[in-house]
Amino acid sequence: MNTEEIINLIANSKKKNPLKVYLKGNLKEVDFSNVEFYGNDEFGILFCEEEDFKTIYETYKDSIINYRIERDRKNSAIPLADLSKYNARIEPGAIIRDLVEIGDGCVIMMGAVINIGACIKENTMIDMNVVIGGRAQIGKNCHIGAGAVIAGVIEPPSAQPVVIENNVLIGANAVVLEGVKVGQGSIIGAGSVVISDVEPYSVVAGVPAKFIKKVDDKTKAKTQLVEGLRKLK
């Protein structure tokens, strides 16, 4: 999806306020036919929109002794992704929005956040607490180190997305700014801030990131990926 399509989708989507509600009372008197309800005549769990619960409560408040609400979003425009569609290892606590592409054999670690429109190709690892912004493009066999930020480009709409080509290693807590292209086989040092394009097979580091050297055999040996971490069975 391009930026305008994503903006239109967010702007025109019906905003959602889903609730999980624990109910106690004389519930046999309550009509749950228009919502998702699990329980019995005295206790139950309700999954519904906020407005639906308000209607139920106002109508049947004399029958409801007590309730507790769990809410994890407010006026949400885009749902989280259905993780069952991915052939990847996705650990608990990763947050992945809908309309994200994740290739076979990828690893998404705890705390990673991946925004709408991002594309991650096969066998790439997104380490703990990484932020992948909207429309970011990440190639095959990459490692995005813990705490790194790959900037998104939903706003402003004119910005070009980050493109990270195949076999790139990005060190922990590095930041890659909007519109930057990181060439194939490159290495970004930990804590670097990348503000301009990186030529293929380059090592860059610093704030802002500067060219250090070309990737050599010694560097490759120190930064090789472990295939076993990407096995799904």
Curated annotation (Swiss-Prot):
Q: Which domain of life is it from?
A: Bacteria
Give the keywords, sorted. Answer: Acyltransferase, Amino-acid biosynthesis, Diaminopimelate biosynthesis, Lysine biosynthesis, Repeat, Transferase
Q: Which parts of the chain are coiled coil?
A: none
What InterPro entries is this protein classified in?
Answer: DapH, DapH_N, Hexapep, Hexapep_transf_CS, Trans_hexapeptide_repeat, Trimer_LpxA-like_sf
- Tell me the Pfam families matching this sequence: DapH_N (PF08503), Hexapep (PF00132), Hexapep_2 (PF14602)
Q: Which GO terms describe its biological process?
A: diaminopimelate biosynthetic process; lysine biosynthetic process via diaminopimelate
Quote the EC number.
2.3.1.89
Q: Which cysteines are joined by disulfide bonds?
A: none
Provide the reaction this enzyme catalyses. (S)-2,3,4,5-tetrahydrodipicolinate + acetyl-CoA + H2O = L-2-acetamido-6-oxoheptanedioate + CoA
Q: Hey, which pathway is this one from?
A: Amino-acid biosynthesis; L-lysine biosynthesis via DAP pathway; LL-2,6-diaminopimelate from (S)-tetrahydrodipicolinate (acetylase route): step 1/3
Q: Which GO terms describe its molecular function?
A: tetrahydrodipicolinate N-acetyltransferase activity
Q: Look up keyword Acyltransferase and say if it applies.
A: yes
Instruction: Give, as one word, the top-level EC class.
Output: transferase
- NCBIfam families, per the entry: DapD_Ac
HAMAP family from the UniProt entry: DapH
Family that this chain belongs to = Belongs to the transferase hexapeptide repeat family. DapH subfamily.
- What functional role does this protein have? Catalyzes the transfer of an acetyl group from acetyl-CoA to tetrahydrodipicolinate.
Q: Supply the name of the protein.
A: 2,3,4,5-tetrahydropyridine-2,6-dicarboxylate N-acetyltransferase
